[in-house]
């Protein structure tokens, strides 16, 4: 084991003992916010320290076997004991490496998923509708709750823009690599000569802001407009100004919400999206600075990056970041994207392990 890794584990061992002492003290629950942070930290490192304890036991077994080898009558037995201990140490070291990988603090959060039609006009809007169905079906398979925050429909039944709120377990962890440009190649419904057209949509996956950590927004920097909500072609027209548009003047960020009949609930939901967008923009700026020093295949989240192509005539989906092509486009457009999500997560983990090895 590398000295740097050993030092990290020794530090965590000491820290767990400190946390045990803090959490059992009489003062522990006087500040509940601080208490929750301590219990979260305890939960994060307890498994690591437990595995490190098993590693140290195997290490002690290997040393005891080495001593035993000095006795000629015990040499064969000692060799076998040492071999087993070394194998256990190697297995535990691999597990500890993965446990020491930096945690994404947003992994367990709910998300706002935004799909915007880009180049390609009506065909792009129809593809946005296809992506909406893909992510909705995927969410249903995961047992997540799906809420439509805002939807701007196009004339042909697609979407110029749609924002979803996905609620459930590890939502951001599963979807965080979906941000970027999604390109589609197919014969549009409006094409009379059978020509293949290329169009695109952008997807943004933004973790829902934690109330304790959310950015503070000055109300004076907001412009709030209300208007009547309506569907495509003027359907479902509300007789009251229940729809809400909030503009954050310093950043120019605009959020609309008209899904609920209550103006109050629309305003509340729009504020949540606004805060998440501002926090997401700050995170992306931070990632771009990091990317200048370490090129990452995945996770830059740059909206201008084309990350994936959906080629319907060939029945394939290609993710350009990891050069993965899967020939099951119908199943994937119906929400079966587990293989893709798993491959992206594995590549990201491999990158983190490589970075840990360099440190």
Curated annotation (Swiss-Prot):
Q: Which residues carry this modification: N5-methylglutamine?
A: 235
* PTM: Methylated by PrmC. Methylation increases the termination efficiency of RF1.
Task: Quote the SMART domains the UniProt record gives.
Answer: PCRF
Q: What Gene Ontology molecular-function terms does this entry list?
A: translation release factor activity, codon specific
Which cell locations does it reside in?
Cytoplasm
Enumerate the UniProt keywords alphabetically: Cytoplasm, Methylation, Protein biosynthesis
Main localization is cytoplasm
Q: Is Oxidoreductase included in the keywords of this UniProt record?
A: no
Gene Ontology CC entries for this record: cytoplasm
SUPFAM superfamilies on file: Release factor (SSF75620)
Return the InterPro entries for the record: PCRF, Pep_chain_release_fac_I, Pep_chain_release_fac_I_sf, Prokaryotic/Mito_RF, RF-1
Check the record and name the Pfam families matching this protein: PCRF, RF-1
Function, as annotated, reads: Peptide chain release factor 1 directs the termination of translation in response to the peptide chain termination codons UAG and UAA.
Similarity comment text for this entry: Belongs to the prokaryotic/mitochondrial release factor family.
PANTHER family of this UniProt entry?
A: LD18447P
Protein's name in the database: Peptide chain release factor 1
Q: Which organism is it from?
A: Polynucleobacter asymbioticus (strain DSM 18221 / CIP 109841 / QLW-P1DMWA-1) (Polynucleobacter necessarius subsp. asymbioticus)
- Name of the coding gene: prfA
